[in-house]
Each structure stands twice: as structure tokens, then as C-alpha cells.
Amino acid sequence: MWPLWRLVSLLALSQALPFEQRGFWDFTLDDGPFMMNDEEASGADTSGVLDPDSVTPTYSAMCPFGCHCHLRVVQCSDLGLKSVPKEISPDTTLLDLQNNDISELRKDDFKGLQHLYALVLVNNKISKIHEKAFSPLRKLQKLYISKNHLVEIPPNLPSSLVELRIHDNRIRKVPKGVFSGLRNMNCIEMGGNPLENSGFEPGAFDGLKLNYLRISEAKLTGIPKDLPETLNELHLDHNKIQAIELEDLLRYSKLYRLGLGHNQIRMIENGSLSFLPTLRELHLDNNKLARVPSGLPDLKLLQVVYLHSNNITKVGVNDFCPMGFGVKRAYYNGISLFNNPVPYWEVQPATFRCVTDRLAIQFGNYKK
């Protein structure tokens, strides 16, 4: 195991894509009490790295048996714990309990931890959470409780919460009011749950002002129509979506990135993409599209389009670029069309007149 001081120093800013938890230290502390201000950084870019010198050391001798404690970080991962340990210092800000055998969160498990900023419970066996288990956590901003046995979203989440990762559980329903009062929530990762479209009650996301939402690897057959309209990123990859209809994207006009790869999409209704004027990146790879979706030339800010591994047989000269010069505000820097039955030698060079570099175009490698 790496020494805690070194792990702390390597804590880096997490990527918006793919938002996959690989370990306790693979998540952000941006805007947290330990984050170095941009003004303090000089030389190399360390704006997302935890600065150990900026952390006020704790002088408490409290540290649960078998755990590693340094500054205000308590690391109790991979210990075979059956319950949340006692003797946790009240000034703890990061608590790592991942990779244990915890099955229940009880009422007083986090009593006195009013300064806790991040709680990691990934890869346990949690199936039951007391309705007041999180009540003491008045400053909690990041809750990672993925890869457990939850069948419902925990009740009474702290109003301070900014990021919730609850993917890879057994959740089938998102009831109305479950996110009530979470005005600070910015990001929810809830993929890998057996969620169907009918599992989202009308108004389930009311009051949320999310920027990021991922519901990948679920059982969706269409794009949910009642998600927060504030979204900048929406990832619905690895579902069973078969078509995009005109009204599906109507309320998501603020999207920068839309992920719909690895679905069963055969049809995108004309005009559907016109509701996404700020879109920068579109993932439609590994679907069943027979042609390039219409409307791409009208997306003035679009820079990346993934269309590989579809059934596209033809690429028209105006499929990607507008007809007039100066219309597109941002040129493409990535278009993937490989693994499609397109005779790429027949595609006219002018087709990619609004691409920054021909190396950004990926063609060929079609396998029947």
C-alpha cells in the first residue's frame, strides 16, 4: 500500500468522461476545502491536485484499528469490515471504506463527523441504510456508494451533496421527491442499474440543476423526457434505445456532450438534433444507423462525432459541413466512420471541408 502522504499528493481532477471510479483517490476535490487555488499554482498545471501543505494537520490520536490516518484522511479500505468503524476523528474530511463487507449503514455510524467532505463506500454489500444515517454529514459533498446491493436511492441525502455516484446497484425505480432539497447537486452517476423508462416517476428530478447525468448500462428503450433541462452532459450508452424522435431532445438545449453509443438506434427523426445548438460532442457509435444523421451541418459548435460501427453505406458531400463558409463557428477535430460499409474512396474530399485536419477523420477497417 502506498503511503498516505503520497496518495494525497497524487489526488487529481477526475475526467467528465467516462466518470468511472477506479479507486478512492480517483475522484475530484475541486472546490473542496483542500483544493489549491488557481492563483497559487505556478509552473506546471497542478490546479486539480491536492496540496498536502495546504491541509491543516490534525493532532487527534484517534484512528480506527487497521486503518491508515493522515491529516484529515481516514483510509479503511480492503479490511473485511462488517460495519463502519468507531473511533473516527471528528475532524475527518475524507473517509474511505471501499472494498469491505459492510451490509448496513446505521443511525449513528457517522455521528460527530460534521466536517466530512467525501465518503467512499464503493464495493461493499450495503442493502440497508437508516433514514437518518447521513443526518450528521452537514458538509458532505461527494458520496460514492456504487457497487453495492441497494434497491432504492438512499433517503434524506445531505442538502450539501454535489456529487452522487450510485451506479452498479439494483435500483429499479426513481420516485418523485427522492432528490428533494438537493439544490447543490451537480453530478449523478447511476448507470449499471436495471432502470427502465417506466422506473422514473414524473417529477423525479424536480428541483435539480444537474450538469452531468449518466444512466448507462441500464434498460432504457428511449431517451427519458423528464430529466433536468440544465444538463450539459447526458450519457445513455449501452442501453436498448431504438430511435430518437423529434421531441426526445426538446428540453436539453444546453447539452455540450451527448452519449448514445452502444444502443440499437436505427432512426433519428429529421430535426431532432436542431434542439441542441450548443452541442460539441456526439456519440452514436455501435448502433444500427444506415446513414449519417441529418442536421449535423446546422450544429455550429459541433467538433466531435462518433459514428463508427454502424451500417452507414454512403456519406454525402453536405452531411457534415454547412454549404456556406463562415457559418460554422468551430471546425471538427474528430469524425469517426470506421467499421461502416462505406466505400471511402468514393467520398468526395469536399465532404470534410470544415475539418481542422484530415488526420481527424477515421475511415476504413470494415468487417462483415
UniProtKB/Swiss-Prot annotation:
Q: Where do the record's glycosylation annotations fall on this chain?
A: S42, S47, S180, S198, N270, N311
Signal peptide (from-to): 1-16
Q: What is the effect of changing K147E?
A: In SEMDX; reduced protein stability
- What residue ranges constitute the propeptide? 17-37
Processing after translation: The two attached glycosaminoglycan chains can be either chondroitin sulfate or dermatan sulfate.
| Annotated phenotype, changing R266T | In a breast cancer sample; somatic mutation
InterPro entries cross-referenced by the UniProt entry: Leu-rich_rpt, Leu-rich_rpt_typical-subtyp, LRR_dom_sf, LRRNT, SLRP, SLRP_I_decor/aspor/byglycan
Looking up Pfam families in the UniProt record yields: LRR_8 (PF13855), LRRNT (PF01462)
Q: In which tissues is it expressed?
A: Detected in placenta (at protein level). Found in several connective tissues, especially in articular cartilages.
Q: Name one GO cellular component term.
A: extracellular exosome
Main localization of the protein? secreted
GO BP of this protein? articular cartilage development; blood vessel remodeling; bone development
Q: Where in the cell is it found?
A: Secreted, Extracellular space, Extracellular matrix
A molecular function GO annotation: extracellular matrix structural constituent conferring compression resistance
The LRR repeats lie at: 82-102, 103-126, 127-150, 151-171, 172-195, 196-220, 221-241, 242-265, 266-289, 290-312, 313-342, 343-368
For this UniProt record, give its keywords in alphabetical order, as a comma-separated list: Aortic aneurysm, Disease variant, Disulfide bond, Dwarfism, Extracellular matrix, Glycoprotein, Leucine-rich repeat, Proteoglycan, Repeat, Secreted, Signal
Reported effect of changing G80S?
In MRLS; uncertain significance
Q: Which cysteine pairs are covalently linked by disulfides here?
A: C63-C69, C67-C76, C321-C354
Family statement: Belongs to the small leucine-rich proteoglycan (SLRP) family. SLRP class I subfamily.
According to the UniProt entry, which disease involves this protein? Meester-Loeys syndrome: An X-linked, thoracic aortic aneurysm syndrome characterized by early-onset, severe aortic aneurysm and dissection. Other recurrent findings include hypertelorism, pectus deformity, joint hypermobility, contractures, and mild skeletal dysplasia. Spondyloepimetaphyseal dysplasia, X-linked: An X-linked recessive bone disease characterized by severe short-trunk dwarfism, brachydactyly, metaphyseal flaring of lower extremities, short and broad long bone diaphyses, moderate platyspondyly, normal facies, and normal intelligence.
Q: Subunit composition?
A: Homodimer. Forms a ternary complex with MFAP2 and ELN.
**What is its biological role?**
May be involved in collagen fiber assembly.
The name this protein goes by in its record = Biglycan
